Structures are given as structure tokens and as C-alpha cells.
Design a protein with these regions (language model features):
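Interfacial loop-to-helix transition and helix-capping segments at the boundaries
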Residues: 42-55, 108-123, 161-179, 214-247, ...
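Alpha-helical transmembrane segments of multi-pass integral membrane proteins
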Residues: 17, 23, 86-89, 150-159, ...
């Protein structure tokens, strides 16, 4: 986390990315995608791509800033505390609401990063531990070499797209490192040609992903083929070249915005990660979407009513995150006044630096 003031275009992208992630989870975990083919279900097919698209944009943003940053182990400790804090809070809420939790849920919530309770934050921690090495590589070469490196890595994405179910050289961490490489190069290279066409690229790729999802759904329904239906969102997967291209388009569309520094936007952007931790805990997920949000009541609702409910969920999450985060930050300040912890942090930083 950097203290210096950031321009708000990337922070606005951070907010946008989290909103589309939440909406993607709304239609997926809320069960809207599993309903009969309808206007609401067609709209859900559009929102479905937001999850992986938003995560890809988040990694691009991180790389954009970290490529010129120094490693700080305190950030890792703060991130681990934040992840575990939210996991424990949610498991307590689940206990209150349902009356029971398992021993596994309790232990894994306390040590959430170790047990990979949240896949995205765990992969991010791994990426943060490695980013100084990637920075050395990126900073060593000129623009021509870096663009060539990106070109040579394109087949890595295509392999996963062409061979359904392939895990060739894939893990959440390796994919984040791959995306980090792209985001770092975006900061170092002149990308004006891409930037000029970025909005067109984003819209075109989003439409292609949407149409492919609808098309495969229709084919699957008509042929009663569950295999086709199960892969209807294949083009919206995080390894899809279309998702990467769409994320690149979205990234540069926001990058070229000239909105200066807006403190309101920057303040809201700080809540994006807490929003993620609040709504996508696998142990709390069913309670949240089924018992609190109750998406099933809006499966067949008027389209405008559905939109209003989605907006209410998004706003509610940001408000809840602001309250929980206010409490967490105060606990964090107490924790990091420990002289012993600060000595450990200093020693780790010396090893990296």
C-alpha cells in the first residue's frame, strides 16, 4: 500500500472491477444462470464474464503500480491479517445465523491464507512474494524485447483455450504471474496504438464472449447436452484469450481517462478488497446468497426490479465493508505496534532488499 496520492482513473477501474465481480457472483452463486432461458437469464450470461474479467483487471492494476514499487513484508502481514479477520467474522456470523459450524471451518477460517479459503487473495500473496524478481526481468529489457516476450507468451493462453480441461503449467499463482508480466509491460512500454482502440477492443470482446455463452446455452438446451451446457461459459474463463483481450481493452479505456485525483473515488476504491472478502467466502457463500440476499426471489422478477436489487446488493456490500474495515483498521494498528513483529518485518525486508 502506497501513501502517495494516486490519480483516480485506476482507482475507478478498481471499483468497476469489483462491481462486475460481485454481479458475476450474483448470477452464478445466486443461481440465476441455472434458470430457464429468459431475458433475465440472457442478461445473466453477460454478467457472468465479470468475475474473471474483474480479477484480470485487478492483477493488471497491481502490476501497474508494483512494477515501480519496493517489496514491503509489512504488506504481506497486513494482508494475511485482513484475510483471516474477515474469514473469522463471517464464520461467527454463520454460527449465529445457522447455529452450527464445523471444526474444519473454524480452523481454516483462522488460518485462511494457509488453507486457501479465498483463492484470489492467496494467489495474490504468492504473486507479491515473487514480484521483485519479475520486476528485475522487466526493468532489464527495452520495449522491443518486452513486447516480443509478451508475443511469445500468447500461446500459453491459447493452449488452455483450445484444450478444454487442460492444466498445462497452470495454477492460480502461475496465471497471476503471467498476467503480472502483461501489466508490468503496460507500464513500461508505449501502448498508444492499443490505447486508441481500447474501448472498441473491450466492447467487441465482451460481445463475443456474451454471444458465445448464449449460443452454447441454446445449443445445449436444444440438444439436451449437459456437456455443452457445462461449458457455456468457457469463453468467459480467466484463461480465455477473449477475457485477456477484453481486460486489456478495459484497462486502457480507464487508463486514458483524465479525471485527476478524486478523494471520494480513492476512498471507495480502498473498500474493494474488503467487499471481495465479505461476499465470496466459500463457507459463508450459501448463507449470503440464499439467506441474506435471497436471489431466488428475483429469478422471474421484472428486469428493472432485478437491476434495482443488484444495485442494492452492491451498495450494501460497500457500506458493510466500510463499517467492518473501520473496526479492522483499529485492530491492525494495535497489532503492528508490537516491537517483536516490527523486528521480524525489518529482517525480512533486508533479505529482499
Amino acid at each position: 500500500m502506497q501513501n502517495k496520492v494516486r490519480n483516480s482513473n485506476m482507482e475507478l477501474l478498481r471499483i468497476f472491477s469489483m462491481i462486475i465481480i460481485v454481479l458475476s457472483h450474483y448470477v452464478y452463486h445466486g443461481g440465476l444462470l441455472e434458470q430457464e432461458f429468459s431475458t433475465n437469464q440472457i442478461f445473466a450470461q453477460l454478467l457472468k464474464m465479470g468475475g474473471k474479467l474483474g480479477v484480470t483487471c485487478f492483477v493488471f492494476i497491481s502490476a501497474y503500480y508494483l512494477i515501480e514499487a519496493e517489496f514491503k513484508s509489512k504488506n504481506i502481514f497486513k494482508l494475511i491479517f485482513q484475510i483471516s479477520f474477515y474469514a473469522v467474522i463471517l464464520i461467527i456470523i454463520k454460527l449465529v445465523m445457522t447455529g452450527s459450524i464445523s471444526g474444519t471451518e473454524s480452523v481454516e477460517s483462522i488460518f485462511a491464507p494457509i488453507y486457501n479459503v479465498y483463492w484470489f487473495p492467496t494467489a495474490y500473496i504468492g504473486m507479491y512474494l515473487v514480484f521483485p524478481l519479475i520486476n528485475i526481468i522487466i526493468n532489464k529489457y527495452n520495449q522491443a524485447c518486452l513486447k516480443l516476450v509478451l508475443l511469445l507468451t500468447v500461446p500459453f493462453s491459447i493452449i488452455h483455450f483450445l484444450f478444454i480441461g487442460s492444466d498445462f503449467l497452470y495454477s492460480n499463482l502461475t496465471w497471476f504471474l503471467y498476467l503480472y508480466l502483461w501489466g508490468g509491460v503496460f507500464r513500461k512500454c508505449d501502448m498508444q496504438k492499443v490505447e486508441k482502440k481500447s474501448t472498441v477492443i473491450a466492447i467487441l470482446c465482451a460481445c463475443l464472449i456474451w454471444v458465445s455463452s448464449i449460443g452454447m446455452t441454446l445449443i445445449g438446451l436444444k440438444t439436451a447436452n449437459n456437456t455443452i451446457l457445462s461449458h457455456a461459459g468457457y469463453c468467459a474463463d480467466i484463461t480465455s484469450p477473449l477475457v485477456i483481450a477484453c481486460a486489456i481493452g478495459v484497462f486502457f479505456t480507464f487508463k486514458k481517462l483524465d479525471i485527476g485525483c478524486n478523494r471520494i473515488i480513492n476512498s471507495i476504491a480502498k473498500l474493494t478488497f474488503p467487499v471481495y472478502l465479505l461476499h465470496d467466502n466459500p463457507y459463508f457463500r450459501q448463507v449470503f446468497w440464499k439467506d441474506i440476499v435471497r436471489v431466488e426471489k428475483f429469478y422471474d422478477a421484472n428486469f428493472l426490479i432485478l437491476l434495482l436489487h443488484m444495485a442494492t446488493v452492491v451498495v450494501g456490500l460497500f457500506v458493510a465493508a466500510s463499517i467492518v474495515e473501520w473496526c479492522r483498521i483499529r485492530m491492525e494498528k494495535l497489532l503492528f505496534t508490537s516491537n517483536y513483529l516490527n523486528r521480524v518485518i525489518d529482517k525480512i525486508d533486508k533479505v529482499y532488499l
